[in-house]
Amino acid sequence: MVKPVIFAICLGVLLSKALSIPLRSFADIELIGSQKSLFPFLGGSAPYFSFPANYGIPTDIPEGCRLTQVQMIGRHGERYPTRSEAKDIFEVWYKISNYTGKYEGSLSFLNNGYEFFIPDESLLEMETTLQNSIDVLNPYTGEMNAKRHAREFLAKYGKLMENCTNFPIFTTNSKRIYDTAQYFAEALGDGFNISLQTLSENSSSGANTLAAKSSCPNWNSNANNDILMSYSRDYLENISDRLNDENKGLNLSRKDAAALFSWCAFELNAKGYSNICDIFSAAELIHYSYETDLTSFYQNGPGYKLIKSIGANLFNATVKLIRQSAHLDQKVWLSFTHDTDILNYLTTAGLIDDTRNLTTNHVPFRDHSYHRSWYIPQGARVYTEKFQCSNDSYVRYVVNDAVVPIESCSSGPGFSCEEGTFYEYAKDRLRGVSFYEDCDVSKVSKEKELTFYWDWNTTRYNASLVNQ
């Protein structure tokens, strides 16, 4: 962790040494929107895209069925890099911008007035918007993603909101997440009286949080380092060697090569396209994508046993809302949080294959069961639908515009799961796991339950925003 003061000094030096950067210039229009095929290879840092494996299942509510509840758990929209991500990007930018020779090969575009995509450190951690984008034509801002999502949500689920126009939207107190929730609320229109319930990510929140990992002292990002370190990173060496051979004296390292992938992804968020992305070969993108899958799988997914307990906190609450749907006036439940919290939730819900681990020996293709970017691109959204068909009710999940059936329970209409069978399934998923006990939450909080869905109208949640 870089201390804030040291980071600010280093960042100031790097920016002062870099080329002058005019904000909001017009780009080559032909380039904007031309790199969508790269999004799945950038580990969830690039702009939103729909879940590729849609199985051909229509997302419409099955004919003859009536929707009775929908829950949405969403990620913040497209953003600038975090401070830790930016540190690595600025280090490689410093080397490149201070290179005194003519750029050759893959970096030759830098000879043509290239503009760096982070003009000011105040943008770090922030959502990309129409105001702060480096290019005024950028179609991938987090702001517009959230607003577009809201209009699509209203078109599909608006009938459930007609009789309950006063409702909350739940968000963590991360500013970019709060901003996403606010943009979403604004785009729903003025026909609703919406209150943003802002929940602290501080560990003292215990179980009453949308960011359970922050309240889990036992979570350890290094728990599976021995596994992760065994994956070959020769592809990074190949990138740095190639760029150094083309530009003698540049002296990029393997770490710099890794940072170029982040540069590529976040520049897409801020600019709508990225020349840096064109540096990589198809094979290098595949290797990088798989490495991000590995890291995520063994840190925040099925490859780390504790994750099922962390995700149980939110999954248990969502199941409870489904059970109570007939007795609750509110039929639409909207929540916004971080990517890792969504991955934890999906892991516990069983929507991610946990029957086999990912190998570090090679990139598997036929048996590649976990794609981080597919589940949590910027602006990711997971819907839980409950609908009634004749006298029976059913539950199913929609992840990033695609129905993702429960593998062991999908015989209902639209490949849904019959309600009673779903509760048995959920009980089995939660058997033997306890967020509070497995995480030793008592070390940081006395809050043993997630209550905000039920007490928001009597307990006002208004945690101060933090830029993280």
From Swiss-Prot:
Question: Pfam families per the record?
Answer: His_Phos_2
KW Signal (keyword) present: yes
Q: Give the keywords, sorted.
A: Glycoprotein, Hydrolase, Signal
Q: Where is the signal peptide?
A: 1-20
Q: Does the keyword Disulfide bond apply?
A: no
CC terms in the record's Gene Ontology section: cell periphery; fungal-type cell wall
For this entry, the protein name equals: Probable acid phosphatase DIA3
Q: Which organism is it from?
A: Saccharomyces cerevisiae (strain ATCC 204508 / S288c)
**Lineage of producing organism:** Eukaryota, Fungi, Dikarya, Ascomycota, Saccharomycotina
The gene is DIA3
